Amino acid sequence: MSVPSSLSQSAINANSHGGPALSFPFPLHAAHNQLLNAKLQATAVVPKDLRSAMGEGSVPEPGPANAKWLKEGQNQLRRAATAHRDQNRNVTLTLAEEASQEAETAPLGPKGLMHLYSELELSAHNAANRGLHGSALIINTQGLGPDEGEEKAAGEVEEEDEDEEEEDEEEEDLSSPQGLPEPLENVEVPSGPQVLTDGPREHSKSASLLFGMRNSAASDEDSSWATLSQGSPSYGSPEDTDSFWNPNAFETDSDLPAGWMRVQDTSGTYYWHIPTGTTQWEPPGRASPSQGNSPQEESQLTWTGFAHQEGFEEGEFWKDEPSEEAPMELGLKDPEEGTLPFSAQSLSPEPVPQEEENLPQRNANPGIKCFAVRSLGWVEMTEEELAPGRSSVAVNNCIRQLSYHKNNLHDPMSGGWGEGKDLLLQLEDETLKLVEPQNQTLLHAQPIVSIRVWGVGRDSGRERDFAYVARDKLTQMLKCHVFRCEAPAKNIATSLHEICSKIMSERRNARCLVNGLSLDHSKLVDVPFQVEFPAPKNELVQKFQVYYLGNVPVAKPVGVDVINGALESVLSSSSREQWTPSHVSVAPATLTILHQQTEAVLGECRVRFLSFLAVGRDVHTFAFIMAAGPASFCCHMFWCEPNAASLSEAVQAACMLRYQKCLDARSQTSTSCLPAPPAESVARRVGWTVRRGVQSLWGSLKPKRLGSQTP
């Protein structure tokens, strides 16, 4: 609606509820520069208050609050007049605007300032009425007098000149900081009576701020507004009248899904999905267009990646984790909307009742898991793309490429099984199978252990895309096969994960079983329970062929006389035929006496309990004393051929080694409180006994050698 350039005196009197008539001491139609001339300003007398300046001396004094408000307005007018500025301008303009205003030296014509003085007149009347009655001003613009009609006609002529001024001022507003109010250019008054309420404002604002003042920072959306059109150079707010956008450029209809907006610009009307930034020509409720028909590319493709976990030996596994990009899916009722050119096609075969009848037959075997899928094709991959840290990005690129491809699904060059028709993906035992649902024809069988990588699409609208990478049997080429699933693809990934866990468990059990069967059964005969023991060390065992003379109890654990007495008693009481041919096995821990023919154990003695050993008076005799119990000792006697030197040395070495082990074990434990006997004493005692026996042996042999050498 056109704005009146001035208001009639009768309308002002009607609004002031019968108050006194207002008169102005200065001409309203005079030139602005004439009123603001430096000479006139020097000789002019500033009125004391706003009412005296407006010619209302008879009006009673207003209240304290109104007086303060009027005083602030008066100060602003005085500062504006002193600075030679437009009094209808807001005093809070930036320094850049002040500099641009001072640079304009050409005076404005009186015709260009008529509208500004009319606004000042309107502001003054409103301020006077507010101070008198303390109520809101009601302006009736219906009944205009002849004076108002003339001024209105003049104002309409002036609007053409003001349009050019508004364009210049808008360019200044673009360069000025946000948050500063724009200058008053137009006062818009409704056609009917309207109450202009005074909200909470600062008292320092002038009266011109009460009408039509626009804030350039009205909202966060306007302050950072950027046009979405490809060819639009405008950076202004959509509220600007000269902006590239019209007021109805953005529409959110109730028939659109949540998150969608209808946008209108010079390129036409298209639909914008706010969370993802995707745009399309067709409404989102209809069949989605291909990417080539979209006015602009997707602004962002979100990829959160797959969780790389330990898989089986021949491949990797990605576990589907909760996506952090969940807010990006807001507003998409159907994840397939606005994504694929074939999304409107049904993935279930027709008719539906027949499909439901076939489901029990498909899942008749509980060990088989079926999933309705559609092959999107395959993409060749390299070993470098499957490297750790790069495989997830490579597979996601394959999913994007095959999901957005522009070729027809029925194109045989797409490389998909079933020529783009519905298929059944079956997980049976350890095999992934692709079966035609109609005649149950097997199209492809892939061993699960040969799958290198599999994953689920994580982009917005890609929750039903499943892909796996395996090597082709014929070409030995790595191929990434992508499928569009009827249900969320994470169900397939979970099932594959369970199968892989089962395969790994079976392999571990089989490996343990093979390791157990590889053992020598002859060594496990005497073991009551098959338990894994540490592998024993192979100890050196020496065997000697002797005659076992038997064992007799003795009174003392040590002494050569004890051994000689036992040997003499046995030799005198028995003959050679009564002696038992035997084998003596000498080990570092045990001395074992076995029968030569029957291999029966005649005696087994622990080396740790051996107390004394010696060679008898006859070099063929050897004996040692063992502790059979507390204060109980036994002497074992042998007849050796050709002599007892080798057997005595072997038993002595076993005693030395065993005693050294006992010393090492006692030094590591602190529980024992008994002092360890010196090693020299034991070694000296055993060595002295053996040395004495050897000396006696050599002494018996020496006379024979000397006698043999004499002629």
Swiss-Prot record:
Keywords, sorted A to Z: Acetylation, Activator, Apoptosis, Cell membrane, Cell projection, Chromatin regulator, Cytoplasm, DNA damage, Membrane, Nucleus, Phosphoprotein, Repeat, Repressor, Transcription, Transcription regulation, Ubl conjugation
Biased composition (Polar residues): 224-235, 288-300
Keyword Metal-binding: no
Disulfide bonds: none
Residue span(s) of domain PID: 365-533, 538-700
Signal peptide range: none
Organism the protein comes from: Rattus norvegicus
Gene name linked to the record: Apbb1
Modified residue annotations for N6-acetyllysine: K205, K702
Disordered: region residues: 140-257, 277-300, 321-364
Function: Transcription coregulator that can have both coactivator and corepressor functions. Adapter protein that forms a transcriptionally active complex with the gamma-secretase-derived amyloid precursor protein (APP) intracellular domain. Plays a central role in the response to DNA damage by translocating to the nucleus and inducing apoptosis. May act by specifically recognizing and binding histone H2AX phosphorylated on 'Tyr-142' (H2AXY142ph) at double-strand breaks (DSBs), recruiting other pro-apoptosis factors such as MAPK8/JNK1.
Lineage: Eukaryota, Metazoa, Chordata, Craniata, Vertebrata
GO biological process terms held by the UniProt record: apoptotic process; axon guidance; DNA damage response; DNA repair-dependent chromatin remodeling; double-strand break repair; extracellular matrix organization; negative regulation of cell cycle G1/S phase transition; negative regulation of neuron differentiation
Post-translational events: Polyubiquitination by RNF157 leads to degradation by the proteasome. Phosphorylation at Ser-611 by SGK1 promotes its localization to the nucleus. Phosphorylated following nuclear translocation. Phosphorylation at Tyr-547 by ABL1 enhances transcriptional activation activity and reduces the affinity for RASD1/DEXRAS1. Phosphorylated at Ser-460 by PKC upon insulin activation.
SUPFAM superfamilies in alphabetical order: PH domain-like, WW domain
Protein's UniProt name: Amyloid beta precursor protein binding family B member 1
